[in-house]
Amino acid sequence: MWKASAGHAVSITQDDGGADDWETDPDFVNDVSEKEQRWGAKTVQGSGHQEHINIHKLRENVFQEHQTLKEKELETGPKASHGYGGKFGVEQDRMDKSAVGHEYQSKLSKHCSQVDSVRGFGGKFGVQMDRVDQSAVGFEYQGKTEKHASQKDYSSGFGGKYGVQADRVDKSAVGFDYQGKTEKHESQKDYSKGFGGKYGIDKDKVDKSAVGFEYQGKTEKHESQKDYVKGFGGKFGVQTDRQDKCALGWDHQEKLQLHESQKDYAKGFGGKYGVQKDRMDKNASTFEEVVQVPSAYQKTVPIEAVTSKTSNIRANFENLAKEREQEDRRKAEAERAQRMAQERQEQEEARRKLEEQARAKKQTPPASPSPQPAEDRPPSSPIYEDAAPLKAEPSYGSSEPEPEYSTEAAGLPEASNQQGLAYTSEPVYETTEVPGHYQAEDDTYDGYESDLGITAIALYDYQAAGDDEISFDPDDVITNIEMIDDGWWRGVCKGRYGLFPANYVELRQ
């Protein structure tokens, strides 16, 4: 042990005068009972044995809260008996004055066929007197023509015989019996009567606000001589009749408004947690009114239909079949023209070879000028250019044929039959027969249909779900079908090549 502690100076200092580590109050009294020691300390929050819950008190509280909630709903909720005029009625004070009720029965006007037209404009074949123009005259009116000036008696005029009509005389005019009185001169007037009698004044002309010479004015007292005990309402008071109605007296005691913390906000906007019905907007809806929310579902639009407008979808679907048929016909015509050009080139080469052979064999002219009848031969091909050289055949009637014509004419029968036969003098227009032409077109279409491979007709409409699929409508034609699987095939429709379900189409025989 002494070796382990060698070289170490261990010093332990004891501080007995310091504070206690537990920091216990000097006046602490441990008054914990035996039960509290067993079930936990009461000084520590949440410790100890918890008391059991009182089920009866809990049930009573729940019942009271439920009753209060139901009473509140009945008071604040809408009442079916009150609305638009009481129980199942109409509020008369809100009803439109010009509106009619369900008990109103309007009287329809009669039809023209039901109206009695004998009553109109005044009874039977007459005129309604209340609608007649006051200035209009009836048929019973007889107008009297005014007499001429030479027929009038002017002894009656302007007042009788040689007089004047009194009712037409001017009121301000005087007659010949009027005698005017001349006013007196100033020197003839008696001025003793004027302004109120003899040396007086006219009482009726005196100014009402004027005072006479007998008036004695009383001088107003000085401010020091006035008794101010009566003023503004009596002794040291205020005149009540002259007091401002909005003014407050000295006896008024102003009541201060309560603070926000002192107000009872349980009453506000219609009582306890309610709404004031008299201030509620008539057009506003309450929380009890449930409005059905519209669905936000949108139908899935296919990829191909997105690029086209909705108004043109139907027209596009109707024109797809027509465009497809026109495209097929254009392809068939192009292939037919190509084949005809190849056949035409081959025939020209064969004709040149026959001409060279005919020139080599031609050494002597024919023995007899009379041509032998030509054998009937079928048309080799529908070549329209062969009709041009054959049009000159009717002019062949001379005894010595021309060398160029004979060689050229001799080459045509050798193309079908390797024998030198002469032409007849009859015009041979039947060389380019029409049935052969149509037969060639049918052969061309048969060849084109054979190039389409396996075809099928769509029974239902199908929208492509991916980029490697195709879409089609009912009765659409699908060509070049490859049966890569039992459930999925590959083909061409509407210019697109891709997969499609096999049970949506029907194969064409």
UniProtKB/Swiss-Prot annotation:
Residues 1-28, 318-409 are annotated as: Disordered. Cortactin repeats lie at residues 80-116, 117-153, 154-190, 191-227, 228-264, 265-287. Residues 393-406 have a biased composition (Low complexity). SUPFAM superfamilies: SH3-domain. Changing Y429E: Promotes reorganization of the actin cytoskeleton and cell motility. The keyword Repeat applies. GO terms for molecular function: actin filament binding; Arp2/3 complex binding; profilin binding; proline-rich region binding. Residues 17-28 have a biased composition (Acidic residues). It is a peripheral membrane protein. There is a cross-link at K144, K181 (Glycyl lysine isopeptide (Lys-Gly) (interchain with G-Cter in SUMO2)). The modification N6-acetyllysine is found at residues 87, 107, 124, 144, 152, 161, 171, 181, 193, 198, 235, 267, 272, 277, 309. InterPro entries: Cortactin_SH3 (IPR035716), Hs1_Cortactin (IPR003134), SH3-like_dom_sf (IPR036028), SH3_domain (IPR001452). Residues 320-359 have a biased composition (Basic and acidic residues). Changing Y384F: Impairs receptor-mediated endocytosis. Increases the stability of focal adhesion and decreases their turnover. The modification Phosphothreonine is found at T364. It comes from the Eukaryota. Residues 311-364 form a coiled coil. One of its GO terms (biological process) is lamellipodium organization. It holds the Pfam family HS1_rep. The modification Phosphoserine is found at S113, S150, S261, S368, S370, S380, S381, S406. The modification Omega-N-methylarginine is found at R119. SMART domains: SH3. This is Src substrate cortactin. It comes from Rattus norvegicus (Rat). The lineage of its organism: Eukaryota, Metazoa, Chordata, Craniata, Vertebrata. The gene is Cttn.
